[in-house]
Design a protein with these regions (language model features):
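Long, contiguous binding/interaction regions
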Residues: 318
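Conserved N-terminal entry element of GNAT/NAT acetyltransferase domains
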Residues: 33, 37-85
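Acyl-donor binding region in acyl/amide transferases
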Residues: 148-288, 293-303, 313
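Short amphipathic alpha-helix that is part of the acyltransferase structural core
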Residues: 68-143, 147-153
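Short, cationic low-complexity segments
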Residues: 324-330
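Short hydrophobic/aromatic beta-strand or adjacent loop that forms the aromatic wall/cage
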Residues: 125-127, 301-305
């Protein structure tokens, strides 16, 4: 959900690298059935999924089955998980271009010299990649990325990334597997529908393969003045606050109260329409909002926490991307 360690809304320019935003509605599947085929392996990953997307020209990629947790091909485009250190490096290079060169974030020490956006989570998580094979077969082919952190990966580090801003104890206690989405971005000229469908098909295949029960991550409102964001913050609190058992709260030292206006004075329809596409898209999928916002001065944003139980997913999304592929024909 989930840019950088978050699902971000930054980057709406069509002529520059941009952060990935989910569509405002679950995408309508193209003609043709989607298939999900489970393959058991003896490699590091206990099982894998090979997904043939319901897109024109879709076919299984020529990747060894042991690496196929996600592998979807449509024409020259492919979405799969990173398999090598070179794949991860390519994702880090793309993230640097988006977050620091385009969005103007302040690089951490060493990032500017290396021209890479890196942190300690990169070697433990899964990286979802979109590749355009017309650009080549190496790092230059990577045009989109999304970072996926499950319990096992977070345990090796000691915490989820969002724990730097929020008390995620209630999320960690959630029964079943949980997934933090972040560091999402798409390169210039690749925001057309096929790329977005590939990304969401890849996330869906991953979610169903690992039986994910809960997804979460941070999303951003532009600007660092909470008073200037009183309308969207108040709307999110009064209309989309998570139920108590799921309600993560911003850390005390970073907590910004979202209850800034009388809810009677809000226009829900107009406010929802004006929200950044990322947040609006997740709300339409059935997401909740945590308690409290967090100002991120490094990136010039005010963050909110998105929580999306898979059980609450909009049924149209399930129908489009769920595991029962044979019912996905248009």
């Amino acid at each position: 959900m989930p840019c950088r360690g978050r699902a971000s809304n930054r980057g709406t320019r069509s002529n520059a690298a941009v952060c990935f935003e989910p569509p405002p509605h679950p995408p309508v599947p193209p003609a043709g059935p989607a298939r999900v085929i489970a393959n058991r392996t003896t490699g590091p990953s206990p099982s894998a999924i090979e997904t043939a997307a319901a897109l024109p020209g879709a076919a299984a990629a020529a990747t060894p089955p042991a690496t196929r947790v996600v592998d979807i091909v449509s024409g020259p485009l492919q979405v799969r998980l990173a398999q090598t250190e070179a794949d991860i490096d390519a994702a880090q290079a793309l993230r640097y271009r988006v977050f620091y060169e385009i969005m103007g974030a302040r690089p951490v020490e060493g990032a500017e010299q290396q021209r890479r956006d890196r942190d300690r989570y990169d070697q433990t998580c899964d990286h979802l990649l979109v590749l355009d094979h017309t650009r080549g077969s190496g790092a230059e082919a990577v045009v989109g990325t999304y970072r996926l952190i499950r319990r096992e990966a977070a345990a090796r580090i000691g915490a989820f990334y969002s724990a730097a801003e929020y008390d995620v104890g209630r999320l960690v206690a959630y029964p079943g597997e949980i997934l933090e989405l972040g560091r999402s971005c798409v390169d210039a000229g690749y925001r057309a529908r096929p790329v977005m469908q590939l990304l969401w098909s890849g996330i869906a295949a991953y979610v169903f393969h690992y039986d994910i029960a809960l997804m979460f991550g941070c999303a951003s409102l532009p600007g660092t003045d909470p008073d200037a964001l009183s309308v969207p913050l108040s709307y999110l609190y009064y209309h989309h606050l998570a139920p108590p058992a799921l309600r993560a709260r911003a850390l005390p030292e970073r907590f910004v109260d979202m209850r800034r206006l009388d809810p009677k004075g809000l226009d829900p329809n107009r406010t929802l329409a004006a929200l950044p596409p990322l947040i609006k898209g997740y709300l339409r999928l059935g997401a909740y909002i945590g308690d409290g916002a967090v100002v991120d001065y490094q990136f010039g944003t005010t963050d909110v926490l998105i929580m999306l139980p898979v059980s609450a997913l909009n049924q149209r999304y399930i129908q489009h991307f769920g595991p029962d592929g044979e019912r996905h024909a248009a």
